[in-house]
Amino acid sequence: MEELIEKLAAKIAVEILKQSKRIIRPDEALISSGLIDSFSLMDLSLLVENEFGVRIEDTELNADTFDTLEQLARLIQGRQ
């Protein structure tokens, strides 16, 4: 799962945050901290679907489902 988290961190930093040098910790809050806003949340959902082939339902686009890289990685692994 560590490799998946590293890949997610890099993709989010570059493609969502547009900050290639940004380091995101596995337990860092993405949504509840405001790092990822509602517009970026849709981009994140599309990134996960396109990159990992995992469908994210609209009802799952919230901090309860994937506020951290760890939560997001577990969701992806559970659906692959």
Give short role names for the model-derived ranges.
Residues 38:
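Catalytic nucleophile serine of serine hydrolases
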Residues 60-71:
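AMP-binding/adenylate-forming catalytic domain of the ANL superfamily
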Residues 1-22, 74-80:
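Thiotemplate assembly-line natural product biosynthesis machinery
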Residues 42:
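Conserved catalytic core of two-component sensor histidine kinases
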